[in-house]
Curated annotation (Swiss-Prot):
Domain of life: Eukaryota
CDD domains reported in the protein's UniProt record: M20_IAA_Hyd
Encoding gene per record: ILL3
Chain sites annotated for binding Mn(2+) 1: C127, E163, H391
Protein name: IAA-amino acid hydrolase ILR1-like 3
Pfam families (alphabetical): Peptidase_M20
Molecular function (Gene Ontology), one example: IAA-amino acid conjugate hydrolase activity
Organism: Arabidopsis thaliana
Length: 428
């Protein structure tokens, strides 16, 4: 469907549904205003896309966001977690709800040829975080216009380092959540057409961890193999033994993954057995307990095989540079609330059930502190080539999603405050 057709259909839906009034007032008004902001949203997103930055080094991205917040008259705290931003809109009093967007790009070379491709070699917004950031800025603009009508406070978290740096953990550590009672986030989804959203209650995304192992032996010439301690054989037998964990120790109805993704030796000579071999990979489970069990068994198998093979094994779980991400588990009450808001916003036919996915997401760190909900927002548009999966150098985003995401964020926040204002008063 062409871009103009999608926008036209959304406008028709807003006009047709506005006659119902009641709870639909907020969503309809937000969607109408967001569609009017589309040109600005596209401009912001393209500026971010052209200048991708990695992990915590988001200086240009952060400066752009702060400039836009200043223009909107929205107050904020900076820096949080090095280059993160926490903005605040509303009364300054409870109830408090948080909205989160990740900002960082990926170390990929963009291979899509278009006027606004990445200007930085080897860096690309291939996971849609530029759009998430833009949607949250769009929500800030929408909410700032209604700040005197907000029945509480909205905190907007612009977070660095989702891609492996556990930026959410560091944002929490530096007080980004404040008094927030709940948090919402979203991610673009190429499996859904633009204009549709996906929801799920309970486990949604996997707990993930990476590991690397160095097995050290004794390296004589290959003509004296009787005197060596061979790390090649030791590593090979260890890798095979690790595969038995999934096939022989885990219920096949449970979602566990253990993948060895690389192996390399400490030498390249044809006639010398290397002194060491390194290998590593990833662990995944739909529960945090599951990943902890996998880590425990990984260590037991590696250490046991090393002892059998007379090698020394050093295991690195990369807790400092790439800590384990908990499982993303959507709160059931927030699931019911979110589905209600999304159906008011776009219509029941646009809200689809999401599938569980074995990807990891550091949004889960927030969910360990307060109830949270993570939404998939569709961007599939075959006519313009918005079909490639995230983390592809050919990833291309349908920018029609930007006003939809902005309105979604804003509607969730205002309606959450509206519903929980009465609870806060009754608890006083």
């Amino acid at each position: 469907m062409a871009n103009s057709s999608i926008v036209a259909l959304l406008l028709l839906f807003v006009i047709a549904s506005s006659v119902n009034g009641g709870d639909q007032e907020y969503p309809n008004q937000y969607l109408t205003e967001a569609l009017g902001d589309k040109e600005w949203l596209v401009s912001v997103r393209r500026q971010i896309h052209e200048n991708p930055e990695l992990l915590f080094e988001l200086h240009k991205t952060s400066a752009l966001i702060r400039r836009e917040l200043d223009e909107l008259g929205v107050s904020y705290s900076y820096p949080v977690a090095k280059t993160g931003i926490v903005a605040q809109i509303g009364s300054g009093y409870p109830p408090v709800v948080a909205l989160r967007a990740d900002m960082d790009a990926l170390p990929l070379q963009e291979l899509v040829e278009w006027d606004h491709k990445s200007k930085i070699d080897g860096k690309m917004h291939a996971c849609g975080h530029d759009s998430h950031t833009t949607m949250l800025l769009g929500a800030a603009k929408l909410l700032s216009k209604r700040k005197r009508m907000l029945n509480g406070t909205v905190r907007l978290l612009f977070q660095p380092a989702e891609e492996g740096g556990a930026g959410a953990f560091h944002m929490i550590k530096e007080g980004a959540l404040g008094d927030s009672e709940a948090i919402f986030g979203m991610h673009v989804h190429t499996g859904l057409p633009t204009g549709e959203l996906a929801t799920i209650s309970g486990p949604a995304l996997a707990s993930t961890s990476i590991f690397s192992v160095r097995m050290s032996g004794k390296s004589p010439a290959s003509s004296e193999t009787y005197s060596c301690v061979d790390p090649v054989l030791a590593a090979s037998s260890t890798i095979l033994a690790l595969q038995l964990i999934i096939s022989r120790e885990v219920d096949p109805l449970l979602s566990h993954v253990l993948s060895v993704t690389f192996m390399k030796s400490g030498g390249s000579e044809f006639d010398v057995i290397p002194a060491y071999v390194e290998f590593g990979g990833t662990l995944r489970s739909l529960t945090t307990n599951g990943i902890n069990w996998l880590i425990k068994r990984l260590k037991e198998v590696v250490e046991g095989q090393a002892e059998v093979q007379r090698c020394k094994a050093d295991i690195d779980m990369h807790e400092d540079d790439h800590p384990m991400y908990p499982a993303t588990v959507n709160d059931h009450k927030l699931h019911e609330f979110t589905e209600k808001v999304l159906k008011l916003l776009l219509g029941p036919e646009k809200v689809k059930p999401a599938n569980k996915v074995m990807a990891g997401e550091d949004f889960a760190f927030y969910q360990q502190k307060i109830p949270g909900y993570y939404i998939g927002i569709g961007i599939r548009n075959e006519e313009i080539g918005s079909v490639r999966s995230v983390h592809s150098p050919y990833f291309f985003l349908d920018e029609n999603v930007l006003p939809i995401g902005s309105a979604t964020f804003a509607a969730l926040a205002e309606m959450y405050l509206q519903e929980h204002q009465n609870q806060t008063k009754s608890g006083d």
